[in-house]
Structures are given as C-alpha cells and as structure tokens.
Amino acid sequence: AEEMDALGGQINAYTTKEYTCYHTRVLDKHIDRALDVMSDMLLHPLIAQEEVQKERNVITEEIYMYDDAPEELVHDALQDAIWRDTSLGMPILGTEETIAAFDADFIRAYYERNYHQENIVLSVAGNFEEKEMLGKLNEKLGGWKRETPFVQHDTHAAYQISCVEKEKDIEQVHVCLAFPGLTREHPQKYALAIFNTLFGGGMSSRLFQKIREENGLTYSIYSYTTAFADTGVFTICASMNPNQTERVFELIAEELKEVTAEAFPEQLIAVTKEQMISNFIIGTESTLNRIGRVNGSSGLGETGYDPATNTLSYLCNITGDADSLDF
C-alpha cells in the first residue's frame, strides 16, 4: 500500500459470486512498478496466522454491520433460497462460523488449488503498446507454473422455487420476489435489461410510478437482473410499512399481468435504448469498467470477450415486438 501511495496510484480488490479481482490504477509511466507490486502479491502472498487473525476480525465486524442492514440482508436470504447448497447461494462475506473456522493452512491450501496459471485472466486498459505490455507481463508471470493440474469444479446451480422469512425488530418490511432470469451469454440478455429498466429500473419505471408515486405505498421499489454463467434471476424488491404488504403484492401482480398482455410502446423503448446506450458508452471511459468486462467474460466460461460494438449492436436491434422481447 505504501509503495502504491508513493506512486499516487490506487490498488484494491473485490469478490463476486464467481471470481476475485485484484486491480491497480497508475499513471502509464509507473506501470513497471505497479506490475512489480501486483505480481509479488500474486506469487508471494503473505499468509501468516497473525495476519489471518487480523483480517478475520475485520470481516467478522463487516458481517455484523451487514446483519444490521435488512435492506441488504434480504438479498442474501433470497439467493440462499433459490440456489441453496451451491456457491451462488452463499454470502460473499461468509458467515461468522465459516470465518472462525479458517486458519492460515486452510487459506494457503485454497491459494495453491485455485491461484493457478490456468485459472487467471490478465486484463489491461489505458495508454500502452500491446507488444511491449505482453513482454512485461511475460517477464513478471511467464515463469509461474503449478506442478499439479488445475481442476475446474462444477458450479451448476439450478433455480429452486422457495420462500424464506427472517424476522427482525424493525419498522419496515423488506421483500424480494425472484423469477428465473437469463444466463450471461443468453442472446436475449439485452432485451431483459431494457425490460428491467422500463419495468422497475428507475424512478420513471412502471413499478416506481404506480406503487410509490401514485399510491405512496412503499419507501422504495425497484427491479434488477443478475446473470451468471449457467443461471440468472430477475428480482423485484420493495420496502414498506407492514400494513401495506398485501396491497403492494397485489399491485406488483397487476403490473406483471399488464406488461405480459401488452407490449411497451416503441417510443418508450427507443428512449430507454438511448438511455442505456449513453450510459454504456460513458461507462467505457472508465478503465476499471473495461477490465471488468474482459474479466467477466473471458474468465467465466464464455466464448470470448464481447466487444463494445457488439453490445451496442444488440441494443440498437431490440424492438417492442414479441420476438425481440421474448425471454
């Protein structure tokens, strides 16, 4: 951290349900030093018991904070219900019990099994020469070899119909309704994204306007999509006074019936497409977003990196007819 601070750079990491990403951002003139730091972390991690204990305490506190946020906890409860007994159903932070069971030997064994030359995606975005960058990466990581072959685990998670309730002494009720969604490579994923934006993805969406603005029944209401390699989910979430729960469910059901029976107007779809295209193009200006797109496709069993031009083409070709929005 001190070395990156001295360069005026940033270094961080995040974990999703399917992968962990370590990333850094520096001026192009500091790339050699940044690669030194990143490769040293990857090849020679400090996995000492005293460091594990420190981090265990930090993560345990994060779990306590998360448990105090029911608007967040409800999403974990939902995913546990629909993907029970699979990795997708497990919270990213873990539980107090699983964190307490880890020690340095356990983490080191995990590192040896999974941090493997056959199980890594390297992505770079910014101002660089490709041939020169490949040479630098090969210099830092080309000699990295594990003697044991990498074993890819079957991560298939079938959607399960279920219902789960968790009681807390709070003023509100937080509800999530989930429906089978689309995988990351499904050809209709962009159509679903447009549907989500129109149905519950913003303050101008049908759900927000009907239930929050017109009837004033919820504190918040929205929908979102989640896509993984072999499964997906479409989720509707709402927060409300317990007395309003039944009426909110009724209105959500009415809105679902209406959008099933009648297509969205072409003009509304056109406006939504332009909004999504603009947001996408602006997002590509971020180097972190660019490397995230590479990591999220190349490393997760997809057929390859989906260029931005393909995404824009798919969005532009979506219309309001039944075939275009058939998912």
Task: Please report, for each region that a protein language model flagged, where it lies by residue.
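Residue-level marker for well-ordered alpha-helical positions
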Residues: 205-206, 246
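Catalytic cores of enzymes that engage adenine nucleotides and/or redox cofactors via long glycine-rich
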Residues: 158-159, 210
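A conserved active-site cap/scaffold subdomain adjacent to cofactor or substrate pockets
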Residues: 170, 181-185, 190-201, 207
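Short linear Ser/Thr-Pro motifs
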Residues: 204-205, 286
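Charge-rich, well-structured scaffold segments of protease-associated domains
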Residues: 2-156, 165, 176, 182-183, ...
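Short Ser/Thr-interspersed hydrophobic loop/turn segments at strand-loop and sheet-helix junctions
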Residues: 5, 203-204
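Flexible, small-/acidic-enriched active-site or ligand-binding loops
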Residues: 162
